[in-house]
Amino acid sequence: MPARTKARKRALDVLFEADLRAADPLEILADHTARADTPVPEYAVRLVEGVAAHRAEIDRIIEQFAVGWTLQRMPTVDRNILRLAIYELLWVTEVPDAVVLAEAVKLAQDLSTAESAPFVNGVLAAVRANQATVTASPPPGEPPD
């Protein structure tokens, strides 16, 4: 399994647990880092930190493009797959959009319901198609474009 694929899964594990426990993802990340048998990949840390920093904005984007669905109505795993992928689409420039979508759909296929993969694909395709109009603030420490 490629390194970034593993990192996405580890990041999803942290985000999922934080969501279920209504906890701060950064605290869950610190806990995972402290008790992990294998180190938490740097890319997983970057993803969790990015989602945590932009969560309100990401959730607004999900609600905008998940027509007919509220965040609370979505399965927890789907909601966090979308958070992870939208962060990558809007703030991680070195990963091609097609890879982000494919990885998110694969996570949904592997970890969620039969309906989840098409749902995740549809929401992310809509975000990607409207990327120019979706406002994404720059990562911390970087100037706006």
Curated annotation (Swiss-Prot):
Q: Which UniProt keywords apply?
A: RNA-binding, Transcription, Transcription antitermination, Transcription regulation
Q: Which domain of life is it from?
A: Bacteria
Q: Name one GO molecular function term.
A: RNA binding
UniProt keyword Metal-binding present: no
> Could you state one GO biological process linked to this protein?
transcription antitermination
Instruction: Reply yes or no: does the keyword RNA-binding apply.
Output: yes
- Which Gene Ontology cellular component terms are annotated? cytosol
* Database matches in Pfam families: NusB (PF01029)
Query: Which InterPro entries does the record match to this protein?
Result: NusB-like_sf, NusB_fam, NusB_RsmB_TIM44
The entry's family comment says: Belongs to the NusB family.
Query: What does this protein's UniProt record list under function?
Result: Involved in transcription antitermination. Required for transcription of ribosomal RNA (rRNA) genes. Binds specifically to the boxA antiterminator sequence of the ribosomal RNA (rrn) operons.
| Name of the featured protein | Transcription antitermination protein NusB
The organism of origin for this protein = Acidothermus cellulolyticus (strain ATCC 43068 / DSM 8971 / 11B)
Protein's gene: nusB
